[in-house]
Curated annotation (Swiss-Prot):
Record note on quaternary structure: The complex is composed of two ATP-binding proteins (PhnC), two transmembrane proteins (PhnE) and a solute-binding protein (PhnD).
Short name of one Pfam family: ABC_tran
Annotated membrane topology: Peripheral membrane protein
Family per similarity comment: Belongs to the ABC transporter superfamily. Phosphonates importer (TC 3.A.1.9.1) family.
Compartments where located: Cell membrane
Keywords assigned by UniProt, alphabetized: ATP-binding, Cell membrane, Membrane, Nucleotide-binding, Phosphonate transport, Translocase, Transport
UniProt protein name: Phosphonates import ATP-binding protein PhnC
Task performed by this protein: Part of the ABC transporter complex PhnCDE involved in phosphonates import. Responsible for energy coupling to the transport system.
Molecular function as annotated in GO: ABC-type phosphonate transporter activity; ATP binding; ATP hydrolysis activity
CDD domains, A to Z: ABC_PhnC_transporter (cd03256)
Chief localisation class: membrane
GO cellular component, one term: plasma membrane
Amino acid sequence: MIEFRNVSKVYPNGTKGLNNINLKIQKGEFVVMVGLSGAGKSTLLRSVNRLHEITEGEIMIEGESITAAKGKRLRRMRRDIGMIFQSFNLVKRSTVLKNVLAGRVGYHSTLRTTLGLFPKEDLELAFQSLKRVNILEKAYARADELSGGQQQRVSIARALAQEAKIILADEPVASLDPLTTKQVLDDLKKINEDFGITTIVNLHSIDLARQYATRIIGLHAGEIVFDGLVEEATDEKFAEIYGDVAQKSELLEVAVK
């Protein structure tokens, strides 16, 4: 379980990114967070593995405080958290296989991984992960030779090879076309269902949130304004999340284009 206890984040310029967040996400959930740009979605997501440090409060993972963790303990906790970014975050000039093997770095010494010395078991796991997202044939291609959708699937394979217990996906389909968007979200959903990996995804599209989530969390101005099951996420609730009905309608139109 991931638990946020009275979590707040204030940026150096005084902007409040999160305001007293109290939230529990159970193991194996597929949670989609929605809200306008600047609502706090990315800040909340990235605070889980401390890419963004919180100002107040505490974040617990399986009963252990990642907020207080340091050194080896922090590295161990981060090893269980896979991160997927809108920008793919791959080493473009490296092969797909090497990018996936990057998910194994946390399990070995710096010297071994720097020299590319991974055991046979890691290679097998990397190949299995690529096969899982239907991109095995690209194992020896350079990452920058792949389409955006293919690169995002490499990111998912990397999280699988990492054997992550939690996957955080920050706007993973924002730059993708509708068909590729479906493929990427289908992959994330199937992995969540097959392996019980807790998955938290930030999305702008209301339509996609309804299609894939088991639970939707709506943020507005750094606060949670909705937290419920998909069937509870009515148009009226989305209007509250996005501020007004006009904004909500505009986003619905974008979602179905």
